[in-house]
């Protein structure tokens, strides 16, 4: 599926993780723990209720119903890494949504839509969850 959004309306980034000595059989958990980290970071920094829909959708509540506001993808990078891609609709208005079941942090009444603040919170949460997973 395609993900489209107007310029500067979302938070879109990739992170290269190198799990090192963690057995490859456990790497399948990386997109899931990233989802938890993204949901945690956004809940803290944007002040919105978040939920995860298996296996990689980030949901927010808009008008009393859950809507997809983001997603997580993972792809193996060589023999020793995994690239995690994250996309979150931050400031999209209702008329900018690609499909009716989509949402954004702004439509979920986020207390902050500053992308720098949101990114820092998500990366801090990812660092925490990734560290726990590695041990």
Please describe what each predicted stretch is.
Residues 4-10, 14-135:
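Catalytic beta-strand/loop module used to bind and position nucleotide/cofactor moieties
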């Amino acid at each position: 599926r395609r993900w489209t959004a107007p310029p500067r309306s979302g938070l879109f980034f990739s992170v290269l993780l190198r799990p090192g000595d963690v057995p490859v059989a456990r790497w399948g958990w990386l997109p899931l723990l990233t989802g938890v980290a993204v949901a945690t970071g956004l809940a803290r920094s944007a002040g919105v209720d978040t939920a995860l829909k298996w296996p990689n959708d980030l949901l927010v509540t808009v008008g009393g119903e859950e809507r997809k506001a983001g997603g997580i993808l993972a792809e193996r990078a060589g023999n020793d890494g995994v690239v995690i891609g994250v996309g979150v609709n931050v400031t999209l208005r209702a008329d900018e949504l690609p499909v009716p079941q989509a949402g954004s942090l702004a439509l979920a009444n986020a207390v902050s839509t500053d992308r720098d603040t949101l990114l820092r919170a998500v990366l801090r949460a990812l660092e925490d969850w990734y560290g726990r997973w590695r041990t």
